[in-house]
């Protein structure tokens, strides 16, 4: 086995190389990463190496040998697959690692994200929904010093940026969202999809699933005439009555 292949071969199902393949297959079946769209990157906390899904691979068929491995310090590739080129998302993933101290980033072409990008302006908003409690607030508990989640009564806000011809051209707008929304763990790209990050791949997965649930709920609320961020008890003021 070559020194490069040692980086991606492990019997541990939680090894980044194995986990990226497992999750990409799952996300394909969720209809989030079809037609080679989307991608995942995970930082190995033991080695400080970035594991990155390549460009142009069918996500349900991806294997560890398809992955790129990059040194987090030098940003040099330690391993490159023969059949694929680096994802155009790579600069965006690196920005999340460097500016948000992310441990993993998930990019999907979720239809819910695309539809919400058409329904909302500069930001996605939803309030007073239980699932919001799965999303980090960006604040720290003064007593426990642990990160705090949003509460049921909070409004989740996710910035929406405009799509570009190439994904690496999104980098300037991504940096701007980091400044304008310092507590966000996601950004929606209009008519494209969503990027979600977290301190670990487990957290990023939870955030992504919760946000997708909330976006789907927001779409259904819009269909009923209910603003997703309306106050508690105000729903019936907006509700579209079904035809008899």
Swiss-Prot record:
Catalytic residues in the record: 130
Pathway stated in the Swiss-Prot or TrEMBL entry: Amino-acid biosynthesis; L-methionine biosynthesis via salvage pathway; L-methionine from S-methyl-5-thio-alpha-D-ribose 1-phosphate: step 2/6
Main location group: cytoplasm
A GO CC term attached to the entry: cytosol
Binding annotation for Zn(2+): 107, 109, 192
Compartment(s): Cytoplasm
GO molecular function, one term: zinc ion binding
Keywords, ordered alphabetically: Amino-acid biosynthesis, Cytoplasm, Lyase, Metal-binding, Methionine biosynthesis, Zinc
Catalytic activity: 5-(methylsulfanyl)-D-ribulose 1-phosphate = 5-methylsulfanyl-2,3-dioxopentyl phosphate + H2O
Record text on cofactor binding: Binds 1 zinc ion per subunit.
Residue numbers binding substrate: 89
Cofactor: Zn(2+)
Listed SUPFAM superfamilies: AraD/HMP-PK domain-like
Superkingdom to which the source organism belongs: Eukaryota
BP GO annotations: L-methionine salvage from methylthioadenosine
Assigned EC number: 4.2.1.109
Family from the record: Belongs to the aldolase class II family. MtnB subfamily.
Function of the molecule: Catalyzes the dehydration of methylthioribulose-1-phosphate (MTRu-1-P) into 2,3-diketo-5-methylthiopentyl-1-phosphate (DK-MTP-1-P).
Database matches in HAMAP family: Salvage_MtnB_euk
Protein name: Methylthioribulose-1-phosphate dehydratase
This protein's encoding gene: MDE1
